[in-house]
Amino acid sequence: MSIFIGGAWPYANGSLHLGHIASLLPGDILARYYRAKGENVLYVSGSDCNGTPIAIRAKQEGVTAKEIANKYHEEFERCFRNLGFTYDCYTRTDSEHHHETVQNVFLRLLEEGHIYKKTVEQAYCETCTQFLPDRYVEGVCPHCHEEARGDQCDACSAILDPLDLLEKKCKLCGSTPSIQETEHFYFALHTFQEQIKRAVEIAKQTGTWRDNAIQLTERYVKEGLLDRAVSRDLPIGVPIPVEGYEDKKIYVWIEAVTGYYSASKHWAEETGKDDREFWDGEAKTYYVHGKDNIPFHSVIWPAVLLGIGEGTIPRHIVSNEYLTVEKRKLSTSKNWAVWVPDILERYDPDSIRYFLIVNAPENRDTDFSWREFIYSHNSELLGAYGNFVNRTLKFIEKYYGGIMPKGSIDVELKDKIERLYKHVGEAIEQTKFKVALESIFDAVRFANKYFDERQPWKEREDDPVSCEETIYNCVYLIANFANLLEPFLPFSSERIRNTLSIVNRNWEPQHTLPSRIDSVQPLFERIDVKQIECELEKLYGAVK
């Protein structure tokens, strides 16, 4: 089976925060799991280097947009690598390859009659002497009356046009823009109304889209899909490939999602492999992103794919809700966030991954608190999992000189592990990652109970053969926990694999155990709870 996984493209205008990772982490879990299953996986993403936020940041700092994009693209790559993300292709939207692919898609839509020209009114700033792209206009949402940008309201998820906003202001200078006529290209989104409606109905029946994606898309369909501009007067981006319109750029909402397609083509060119199987309609596709990106993946990207006759409507939409920090909404402008480069300097990446999965905002907003993060590490990763691994392997090191005791796998344990693989695999495929991880840790707690009840420290004196059986089965559990947890906690799983000399990485019960255990090291270190206050002081002290 061919599995295509697309992770949303973060804007290269500032550092990643934990909210980004909470929404993107499911993609890596899926990729690791399906590779272990032996499926053909293509997992892509990249940095959005063409968006208005980059141009605004560059203007504020007095540098070029390219300098801003380069800085954060490199930082993103480093962060994703250090968190264990296993993209097959992580690229950027300002590459020549991406520009060519997007222009080809634009021309195909134009040739098929899905794009047309239209004279429209647009916000124009007399002070800055330029037409204002959507994100250059800010004001009040006409639907919920919260602060909003000209392209979308984060509060109610409404897709907006800058002219819809109340109390419009130019983001660059703060002045009130005038309204002037200009010509732009439009995408005939309304012609895909019935196909998108059918896609939502199927998703509702199969449960393959998150509830928030179903509800929001149903709302758009009920209101009637409106044609959307596909060109804008932007300072950076992909030029319109039509004579006389080269100064205009392809609007980022259609250009950025086409990044999945361009990244796929780039991967094919770089590896010499064929990517067509990921777009032939038979592939299982997963699109992983935050709630704010739902309409781009449930309406716009499907319409583009239908318009060019390529691929299928996204089968799985994995759209997490929002992550708050200490019960407050994340705010990058106020510096109310936990920044990824910062937290990676001091904490184990598996600790970060564990907390963001077990507290994932899968169906509702969830909160990151330093207290819960540190207690979660100490009680679950160290106290439950690390403790079971360490005391088992240290027992072998101390009483058997590192030589693996002889034994046979207990039938009940074998059955339990086989059922666990099936249950966890099904949960991952259904994008229920929290359920999957909690199931494994339920088994870890069972393993600790098994160790305590068998009391190998007593068995060693009273019944040496029974003691060997106990320890042998504990190692069997450890080997399989490492395998089951690899999609979630890859770094600690790799350390266990090395200690146990495990070579097989397939998604199946591990029955081959080592003959010897070498270099037993603690799987996790305890985090001093005093760090909670230190981190809170740092967080509150940095607020703007």
UniProtKB/Swiss-Prot annotation:
Its EC number is 6.1.1.10. Binds 1 zinc ion per subunit. GO terms for cellular component: cytosol. It is found in: Cytoplasm. Its main location: cytoplasm. GO terms for molecular function: ATP binding; metal ion binding; methionine-tRNA ligase activity. Keywords: Aminoacyl-tRNA synthetase, ATP-binding, Cytoplasm, Ligase, Metal-binding, Nucleotide-binding, Protein biosynthesis, Zinc. Its cofactor is Zn(2+). InterPro entries: aa-tRNA-synth_I_CS, Anticodon_Met, Met-tRNA_ligase_1, Met-tRNA_synth, Methionyl/Leucyl_tRNA_Synth, MetRS_core, MetRS_Zn, Rossmann-like_a/b/a_fold. It is an enzyme of class 6 (ligase). A motif ('KMSKS' region) lies at residues 329-333. ATP binds at residue 332. It catalyses: tRNA(Met) + L-methionine + ATP = L-methionyl-tRNA(Met) + AMP + diphosphate. A motif ('HIGH' region) lies at residues 10-20. Pfam families: Anticodon_3, tRNA-synt_1g. Monomer. Belongs to the class-I aminoacyl-tRNA synthetase family. MetG type 1 subfamily. Is required not only for elongation of protein synthesis but also for the initiation of all mRNA translation through initiator tRNA(fMet) aminoacylation. PANTHER family: METHIONINE--TRNA LIGASE, METHIONINE--TRNA LIGASE, CYTOPLASMIC. This is Methionine--tRNA ligase 1. It comes from Bacillus thuringiensis subsp. konkukian (strain 97-27). The lineage of its organism: Bacteria, Bacillati, Bacillota, Bacilli, Bacillales. The gene is metG1.
